[in-house]
């Protein structure tokens, strides 16, 4: 992997961890972008992937500002396209992804966390999109994903001020899904992964698709899409296995 700044390991059957390890703050430059692509390639067989950090005090601190200050507009746009590309790949992955956030998740770091299916944040975590303080806007999905998680008003508050949101407030507004003691985000994310691994991954992915569609489709179309997803699961055999396992009082053997 690129400069070994993203390390993938198997934590348990079907569960992988991709650890960011680019001192001092996991700046999301090309090494981490390329490293994430490589890690996702290696995690192709996993059902759940946890994104974590080994850098104390940081999940990821966004773009490499020192480097970005030296490039022209074309190069800056190309960098943004590459960052959005890996985050969009993460968001569309055929698995459940969990961001385990201890410390700061700022700018692209928060955008990385928001691209995951779920977010576990520790009490020491802080979140922010401070791009307006640099004369920019969040450009790797932040303006689109944050309102979906916390609503328009809260999203504007966070983005227009560029302030850092403490973990307790982030949990209350829905920016993170589970709040855990400081230093335990990765452990808690792996425990959550253990809960998730027992269910049908195709059904879980269908839930994500259907919930995401709720933001874009009129209600009646959303209902129809829900029925379509359920029918596909029934025809695929996932539902048949789940129902049979329930009646036979045994763990399901999902594909």
List PLM regions with ranges:
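Glycine-rich phosphate-binding loop at the start of an alpha helix
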Residues: 62, 80, 84, 107, ...
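A structural preference for short, pocket-lining loop segments at secondary-structure junctions
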Residues: 12-22, 31-71, 89-100, 122-126
């Amino acid at each position: 992997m690129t400069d070994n700044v993203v390390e993938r390991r198997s934590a348990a059957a079907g569960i992988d961890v991709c650890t960011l390890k680019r001192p001092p703050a996991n700046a999301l430059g090309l090494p981490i972008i390329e490293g994430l692509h490589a890690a996702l390639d290696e995690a192709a067989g996993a059902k759940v992937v946890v994104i974590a950090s080994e850098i104390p005090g940081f999940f990821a601190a966004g773009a490499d500002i020192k480097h970005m200050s030296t490039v022209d507009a074309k190069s800056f746009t190309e960098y943004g396209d590459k960052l959005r590309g890996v985050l969009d790949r993460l968001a569309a992955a055929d698995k459940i992804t969990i961001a385990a956030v201890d410390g700061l998740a700022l700018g692209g770091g928060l955008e990385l966390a928001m691209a995951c299916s779920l977010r576990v944040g520790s009490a020491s975590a802080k979140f922010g999109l401070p791009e307006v303080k640099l004369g920019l806007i969040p450009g790797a999905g932040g303006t689109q994903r944050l309102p979906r998680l916390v609503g328009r008003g809260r999203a504007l508050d966070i983005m227009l001020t560029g302030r850092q949101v403490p973990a307790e407030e982030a949990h209350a507004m829905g920016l993170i899904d589970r709040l855990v003691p400081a230093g335990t985000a990765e452990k808690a994310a792996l425990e959550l992964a253990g809960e998730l691994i027992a269910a049908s991954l195709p059904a879980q992915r269908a839930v994500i698709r259907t919930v995401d569609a709720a933001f874009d489709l009129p209600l009646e179309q959303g209902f129809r899409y829900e029925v379509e997803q359920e029918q596909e699961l029934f025809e695929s055999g996932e539902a048949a296995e789940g129902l049979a396992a329930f009646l036979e009082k045994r763990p399901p053997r999902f594909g």
